[in-house]
């Protein structure tokens, strides 16, 4: 699933703008302008980094990811040997730290299923979840600079004896503080009807402004048009 979206040389992993942008749009259905090839403040999708970690280290019963820096096309990340605490770095600067606990599964079917389900869920939260959620408190993102940034995410399984867990979204939360806010997007993992795990994605929002329905309608229309215009072949 990830071949073609990164390159590795001398033990370091990097991403071109085209690779990162194609992953965002093709795999995650994520049209955040930060992932556009020509973005001035370009960054590699956090979901691509998450996927790379699972692809290399497997799935642990408990995993917590903290995104500490924006990775662009100039960054070459070092992936260390597998430990309970992992840091993806360049020149001692940490871009992503991962804490792992419990047993670890290297089952490829589980890993690929989890990557696919999580990335699809994660990429589709804007605008269809985030905008209505913020609207409940009469605020919205700034359409001129829609700054929605990945802060952290976590997953937890009661056991790893499963190959294709199904991810189900549960009630999101939004904490407003002035012109900034934090969005929490929780979910559960199921095997049939049985809940076997849980997790959450945490995002930071800045430049928050007063809610305007007309502007929201225009923003959603603009976003939907971007999906048509920018969908990779």
Feature-to-residue mapping (PLM):
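N-terminal ordered "arm"
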Residues: 2-62
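Long, helix-rich, hydrophobic modules that act as membrane-proximal anchors or helical bundle/coiled-coil regulators
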Residues: 169-171
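Extended, compositionally biased flexible segments
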Residues: 44-87
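Glycine-centered secondary-structure boundary/capping sites
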Residues: 36, 76, 138-140
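HotDog/MaoC-like acyl-thioester-processing domains
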Residues: 1-24, 69-71, 80-166, 175-233
